Amino acid sequence: MSEIDTAVTVIGGYLGAGKTTLLNHILRTADERIAVLVNDFGDINIDEDLIASQDGDTISLANGCICCSLIDGFSSALATIRALEPQPQRLVIESSGVADPATVAAYGHGPGLTLDATVVVVDAETIRTKSRDVYVGDTIIGQLRSGDIVVMNKVDLVNDEDAQAIDEW
């Protein structure tokens, strides 16, 4: 097993924000060996199907949230990734749309791992409305606060003035 820690990047953000699109871009353009851990909240792991054609080792966790009900499975998946040969240089964790990225990122400090960044993806067209929603608003605000980097996606769907207002928000 390698003595160099595996860099960990967590991708979070609410449902439909563009997490899988960002992950696919990373996989297409990366010049390093990447392992991917995908967590979907429902019974069907849609995100895993969307990234299956990309290079890299992919482990999926379905029907629960990485940060609460799947802790044992998540720990087991991390052990599997750490045992891969050759060792991946980076682990990208795509958390479910309802997960708290900060909780998931805490695993990036485990043995043999170094947390690189927590990236939160937001949908420019819907972020302000969804952030005020009585059911999901607190989750979205919490996700935004936990990000080291916030990626505003779908900016082509809003005018320049709205994009600027969201950026300042």
Please tell me what each predicted stretch does.
Residues 2-12, 17-140:
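Nucleotide-state-sensitive switch-loop elements of NTP-binding domains
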Residues 122-125, 147-167:
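G-domain G4 guanine-recognition motif of GTPases
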Residues 139-148:
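Membrane-proximal helix-turn-helix segments that form the acceptor-binding/catalytic region
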